[in-house]
Amino acid sequence: MDYFTLFGLPASYTLSLEQLAVRYQDLQRQYHPDKFASAPAAEQLAAVQHSATINQAWQTLRHPLTRAEYLLSLHGFDLASEQHTVRDTAFLMEQLELREELDEIGQAKDDARLEGFIKRVKALFDTRQQLMVDQLHNESWEAAADTVRKLRFLDKLRSSAEELEEKLLDF
């Protein structure tokens, strides 16, 4: 059973996080291992396994990138374990330039410049994420997989920038 079915939701990138959370809580109440404490060992084990599956599904579906990766896996694109990389030279050059800029900002300890950088990376991420949403909606799986690969780069860059921001604030 796929995670969307487990939560009683359509297999779609766009979903209600509120509805997902409600279903998660319902399933956790229903299958929590403590409810099976006096049951036979086989039922206890099944409850633990089902609870673990529910938790994994929750973690996967609540985050946009992992939800997209999972949806693509249902259509034959296993991005989580693939060795495929981005081949878009212009995109890769842009990433190198952004990484260099982030390094310069860190060396200069320039809070204002970092704030603008984070906003710019977020805008790049949001634009590409909307492209991915359109590709998933149109069932352009190959194009969506490529966009997810690029979103991973931007997500890591955003995380690095936010880590630098925390470091500069602590300084």
From Swiss-Prot:
PANTHER family: IRON-SULFUR CLUSTER CO-CHAPERONE PROTEIN HSCB (PTHR14021:SF15). Interacts with HscA and stimulates its ATPase activity. Interacts with IscU. Keywords: Chaperone. CDD domains: DnaJ (cd06257). GO terms for cellular component: iron-sulfur cluster transfer complex. NCBIfam families: hscB (TIGR00714), PRK05014.1 (NF003449). Belongs to the HscB family. SMART domains: DnaJ. Residues 2-74 form the J domain. GO terms for molecular function: ATPase activator activity; protein-folding chaperone binding. GO terms for biological process: [2Fe-2S] cluster assembly; protein complex oligomerization; protein folding. The keyword Chaperone applies. HAMAP family: HscB (MF_00682). Co-chaperone involved in the maturation of iron-sulfur cluster-containing proteins. Seems to help targeting proteins to be folded toward HscA. This is Co-chaperone protein HscB.
